Curated annotation (Swiss-Prot):
Cellular compartments annotated: Secreted
Keywords: Cytokine, Disulfide bond, Glycoprotein, Secreted, Signal
GO cellular component terms attached to this protein's record: extracellular space
PROSITE patterns from the UniProt entry: INTERLEUKIN_4_13
Name under which the protein is recorded: Interleukin-13
GO-annotated biological processes: immune response
GO molecular-function term, one example from the UniProt record: cytokine receptor binding
Gene behind this protein: IL13
Record keyword Translocase present: no
């Protein structure tokens, strides 16, 4: 009996480690894309006074990395809604000391960052939409 219980607990733990990272709903991802499109569409002046943010690797923890990169941008009402959306999409809570998964070696303008995030979000949405439709 004890051996059986140990096996069940072991499989439960391994299953938890192997389970995929929670993914946002298609609706949440679509709303983020719409917001990013709104930001980039009618932009004439430099976004957020030309503020610079750390470039990130969007292939891992995209929403958390994007949130972390934009966290220090203040007094820029244009991206506040995006920051809130990224905060909701990231399953990890911000700690007092933010530690990054990416190497902080390249800074880019917020405008370029938002455009890159938009393109990557669209790719993720289309890829997931294709896979969701195949499962149906």
């Amino acid at each position: 009996m004890a051996l059986w219980l140990t096996v069940v607990i072991a499989f439960t733990c391994i299953g938890g480690l192997a389970s995929p990272v929670p993914t946002p709903s298609p609706k949440a991802l679509k709303e983020l894309i719409e917001e990013l499109v709104n930001i980039t569409q009618n932009q004439k002046a430099p976004l957020c006074n030309g503020s610079m943010v750390w470039s990130i690797n969007l292939t891992t923890s995209m929403y958390c990395a994007a949130r972390e990169s934009l966290i220090n941008i203040t007094n820029c009402s244009v991206i506040q809604r995006t920051q809130r959306m990224l905060n909701a999409l990231c399953p990890h809570k911000l700690s007092a000391k933010v530690s990054s998964e990416h190497v902080r070696d390249t800074k880019i303008e917020v405008t370029q960052f938002i455009k890159t995030l938009l393109q990557h979000s669209r790719n993720v949405f289309h890829y997931r939409s294709f896979n969701w439709s195949k499962k149906s």
